[in-house]
Amino acid sequence: MNELKSYVFPAPGERVDASHASPETLELLTRRRSTAAINLGEPGPSEQQIEHLLGIAGRVPDHGKLAPWRFILFDGEARASFGNILGKIYSATTPEATAEQIRCEQERFVRAPLVIAVISSVLERHKVPVWEQELSAGAVCQNLLIAASAMGFAAQWLTEWYAYDPDVKDLMGLRSGERIAGFVYIGTASEQPVERNRGRAHIGRWKA
């Protein structure tokens, strides 16, 4: 299950196909659905699969070739350790929190076998606008979701309060100009997600 074939990333300067006609890819994108992190369990990706996931994640539009993102991985015992600290921070900043609410925060990162934090790491004084650099980090998150699904895993992209908490950012070693684009939870679905209502896109055509 979830076996990884031997895929090879192109080398710099190598010519690559401009298009990849693939009904399977269209089917995946047409029916892709996030799975709630609470419904993600073992097994998670192997080390080889994680390496490939991160490689795919970085194959996004990147104005200026800046690669303005980085990853922090949470797996194994590190998930519970980080969760315990989250619980302490939440308890300190939310004095009215109940024991059950604190426990919920402590268990945030053990819901899935693997959590990948995608850090938007922009160059603030670069000619490429910060907004465009941040969009690239968002595309990285989406690539992780799609690649995880293609590997046979389920995933969810979340932020939650701890993506914006200054103490959590310090704990994770974020530098000036860095923001958490999201936490991508990856594992095996314990149940199939149900499709949600999706609003119709507002589409217009510009006319001279």
PLM regions: where:
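N-terminal amphipathic, basic helical "cap/leader" segment at the start of enzyme domains
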Residues: 1-111, 208
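Short, charged/polar surface micro-motifs in flexible loops or helix N-caps
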Residues: 76-81, 87-88, 122-124, 166, ...
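Small-aliphatic-rich amphipathic alpha-helix that forms the alpha element of a beta-alpha
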Residues: 57, 116, 122-171
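Conserved hydrophobic/aromatic beta-strand scaffold that supports enzyme active sites
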Residues: 28, 115-117, 183-185, 205
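Phosphate/diphosphate-binding glycine-rich loops and adjacent basic-rich segments that engage nucleotide
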Residues: 195-208
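Generic beta-strand structural signal
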Residues: 112-114, 151, 180-182
